[in-house]
Amino acid sequence: MLIKLLTKVFGSRNDRTLRRMRKAVSLINAMEPEMEKLSDDELKAKTNEFRARIEKGESVESLIPEAFAVVREASKRVFGMRHFDVQLLGGMVLNDRCIAEMRTGEGKTLTATLPAYLNALSGKGVHVVTVNDYLAQRDAENNRPLFEFLGMSVGINLPGMPAPAKREAYAADITYGTNNEYGFDYLRDNMAFSPEERVQRKLHYALVDEVDSILIDEARTPLIISGPAEDSSEMYKKVNKIIPHLIRQEKEDSDTFQGEGHFSVDEKARQVNLTERGLVLIEELLVQEGIMDEGESLYSPGNIMLMHHVTAALRAHALFTRDVDYIVKDGEVIIVDEHTGRTMQGRRWSDGLHQAVEAKEGVEIQNENQTLASITFQNYFRLYEKLAGMTGTADTEAFEFSSIYKLDTVVVPTNRPMIRKDLPDLVYMTEAEKIQAIIEDIKERTANGQPVLVGTISIEKSEVVSRELTKAGIKHNVLNAKFHANEAGIVAQAGYPAAVTIATNMAGRGTDIMLGGSWQAEVAALEAPTEEQIAQIKADWQVRHDAVLAAGGLHIIGTERHESRRIDNQLRGRSGRQGDPGSSRFYLSMEDALMRIFASDRVSGMMRKLGMKPGEAIEHPWVTKAIANAQRKVESRNFDIRKQLLEYDDVANDQRRAIYTQRNELLDVSDVSDTINSIREDVFKATIDAYIPPQSLEEMWDILGLQERLKNDFDLEMPIAEWLDKEPELHEETLRERILAQSIEVYQRKEEVVGAEMMRHFEKGVMLQTLDSLWKEHLAAMDYLRQGIHLRGYAQKDPKQEYKRESFAMFAAMLESLKYEVISTLSKVQVRMPEEVEAMEMQRREEAERLAQMQQLSHQDDDAAVAADLAAQTGERKIGRNDPCPCGSGKKYKQCHGRLS
């Protein structure tokens, strides 16, 4: 109450921010007459004037009023569009390292031109980040005339572009591209073998469109570049045959409940748990198939990989559904993005899950992959000097933006007041009743000439609604991952009178729905339209536009609630743009996933009390509140998962930064001989110390062991025992010096043969290759550590602290291995003539190119990472699922080391 009162008196933080910025808007408006007087050339010359002022030490911030006034005037001349005052406010918010919440239809694309131009003046580059290639291309081409008029270059960064084209795109003042492509380029740059192979510049300013989709929805999914591992496709096929024999039961066995099935599914945690009976049956079937020996346990350490295959196959059958989580196209399993409903071509699930789904669908199984490099979006975007974003719906996630990215959210007012009617939810008992009610609503609305947009959460649901509409004889368009090639065309005409459009998640569709359809799209469809044709198209559009306004604008139907209120708001936001009328309503049933998992008992209890009849709906504030609470629960759970992931990834991130900094320094220098000499000293000191402990008696020295080690690991034949016999005065220190001096001498002789330049080149190559190889192994080891670390909680230890401690120890060990491997490789190398070295380098490049083509870019869902390393030493004794776990945690085996992810 007190907070409300104080807000009324002093205004909220949002109001105060906008009040401060409105003063600058007045300044920009005051400059307008002055800018109008300038000729085109004088206006263009402003860019160089601003650049010169920045070079002399003026700050970018001090140029805001003038620079924004220049962009507004240029936009009037190039596009015939003048930035509204609210768009100027949005531009300032974006320059202020904040997130601008701007409603759909308020012109976010035009708003972005202001901070993009301003921040490009410093010459360090601006990255505009969009959710898909289509939008990156569209926005770049749409804004190119404006930026080029002002003397700015524009680049587009698309997947599959050759490196020179990418380098050119990044060298431009303003670069458009997708979040994935920027992230993958960063990883690829840190795998480059020469400075010329890198494409990105230093990361300066990122302007993220649909920022909630990129920084929140996709934050749980790391970007991964992986290379091929060993082939195990036959095993996936064999295990896949076994799974259909298993029967699912409703809930997990417990002291009070014993089911009849073989496994249970925890939908909330997306996990599958084998029952005691299931385990026995699987072991019998594995023995029958000849995969496992009789009397063996699936949980014995030797069967860890087999357990991994069984887990993956179970999850593929029980948790992943065709046309919801993936589609099968041209004999390939393609993932469907759960947030946007788009297909993710070339992406693969990790941990063998993709192969298990391929086996289930009977398509060709592709090899498993090994991680070569990975980063989360959270850590990638935090590398930018300056970060800002815009979206139609950020306010519900303001806390997360602030706590993780240190970004404040500012709600920018709309240019015209919003008059859309958001009707209360209707809840039905069954899915069929709900679909029927939706069809009736569509019939009623289209009879009045009102266009309808139906939002569904999966391809499967969109096809169910489509079939029912076809039965009812209602013409409609379907927009889902299967047909998104003609997506923009469908969206552009979704505002036609009585048009019906079904769409999977509308997040990130990026095209406004114009009431009466898009006359621009009709003009674009004609080859060489005359003035009369254009005038006629506009006149026809005006008639349709007025008819749709009279019918009540665009009506939105949601077929079920999403996990996040934000995505519901995005769907609603497609209607009522720029002060247009519109309406929206969500239809729900007790069979919807969200209701079933999170809100079922309470709401179905209410419905029974109210004595519902088939076909009847409940419309009550209590129900709406219960649903909002369910969504809040899911949102906070997802936030916790993302925060947890980030805390763990921060550990890896510090190491990644250290390795990448070291690697880039290596790339940028041509001579690493000083480094090599320094680490050679360290390596020989540590090697000698292992056999001749410092300050020890001669009886404790293992001279033969040292000679053997020097021969095997460094290819050095040294008669140390003979030296000691002949020269009694040789002591520990002088012996060390002699061994080191001899090793340097042998190395210098090799250098004389091939020449110093070739040797420097070779040293650098060895260091880079060794670093990459060890980093790859380190990433795999970190993955294993991460999967089993939660079990430390049973020993009253904080898993996060343990993870930090152990991963640091592993990192330190990796750096020691790096030194040892580099010196060992350089010592063992057989010297050849320069021509042969050149040929070997050529061979290495060809091999690198071949591997690059085999690399997979994936955007793996980390929630689904397989848990619990099953290396518990269970011995020969078979452990019951409900027995105490032998690790001593006090938990049941099935809930500890016997737990299936």
UniProtKB/Swiss-Prot annotation:
The keyword Cytoplasm applies. It catalyses: ATP + H2O + cellular proteinSide 1 = ADP + phosphate + cellular proteinSide 2. ATP binds at residues 87, 105-109, 512. It is found in: Cell inner membrane; Cytoplasm. Its EC number is 7.4.2.8. It holds the Pfam family SecA_DEAD. Zn(2+) binds at residues 885, 887, 896-897. One of its GO terms (biological process) is protein transport by the Sec complex. It is a peripheral membrane protein. GO terms for cellular component: cell envelope Sec protein transport complex; cytosol; plasma membrane. May bind 1 zinc ion per subunit. Its cofactor is Zn(2+). HAMAP family: SecA. Part of the Sec protein translocase complex. Interacts with the SecYEG preprotein conducting channel. Has a central role in coupling the hydrolysis of ATP to the transfer of proteins into and across the cell membrane, serving both as a receptor for the preprotein-SecB complex and as an ATP-driven molecular motor driving the stepwise translocation of polypeptide chains across the membrane. NCBIfam families: PRK12904.1, secA. This is Protein translocase subunit SecA. It comes from Salmonella paratyphi A (strain AKU_12601). The lineage of its organism: Bacteria, Pseudomonadati, Pseudomonadota, Gammaproteobacteria, Enterobacterales.
